[in-house]
A protein has these predicted regions:
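Amphipathic, charged alpha-helical segments and their helix-to-coil junctions
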Residues: 25-28, 32-35, 39, 44, ...
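General helical structural elements
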Residues: 6-7, 41, 77, 132
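Bacterial Sec-dependent N-terminal signal peptides
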Residues: 1-25
Length: 154
């Protein structure tokens, strides 16, 4: 897992250097992450040959939806990066509502796809999928939070 954390750290090292990211840059960033991630999933989840095709169909569907949530998160983080120095109490409340809702959306997505993976493979494969996704999200959140400056009280 240390190798995995290192990969994640490398992918997210420049997150707060985005100044005015456009959709193409976000898509490129996510496609790079998606390629690395699929190799990681293949290594750790290891669906059996009999279920492999069904697993990857469900996984690809999950990734499509996860990327949408990822884009929303990147946009929110860009907003934070440009506003944190002058953020008001009201703006912080609004930003927190959005990020909490996004975290909930992401967590529900994983649970939903855990159930789908369990139906097309085995409970063990589904559990590994859930463990890996939770690990990756936790590691990514850690890397992001580690780079985020604290908002000053005005």
């Amino acid at each position: 897992m240390k190798k995995l954390t290192f990969i994640i750290a490398g992918l997210f090292a420049g997150l707060f250097t985005f100044a005015q990211s456009n959709t193409e840059e976000i898509d490129l960033f996510q496609s790079m992450y998606g390629i690395e991630k699929k190799a990681i999933v293949k290594e750790f989840v290891q669906p059996k040959a009999i279920n492999r095709e069904a697993f990857w169909e469900v996984y690809d569907s999950y990734e499509t939806k996860r990327k949408v949530v990822g884009k929303e998160r990147i946009i929110l983080l860009e907003q934070f990066a440009t506003q944190y120095e002058k953020m008001t109490n009201d703006e912080s409340i609004l930003w927190m509502k959005k990020i909490i809702a996004l975290d909930d959306k992401q967590d529900k997505l994983i649970v939903s796809y855990y159930k789908k993976v369990s139906k097309v493979t085995t409970p063990i494969v589904a559990m590994r999928f859930y463990q890996l996704e939770t690990y990756l999200i936790t590691a990514i959140r850690y890397e992001i939070l580690n780079e985020m400056p604290f908002v000053e009280d005005k």
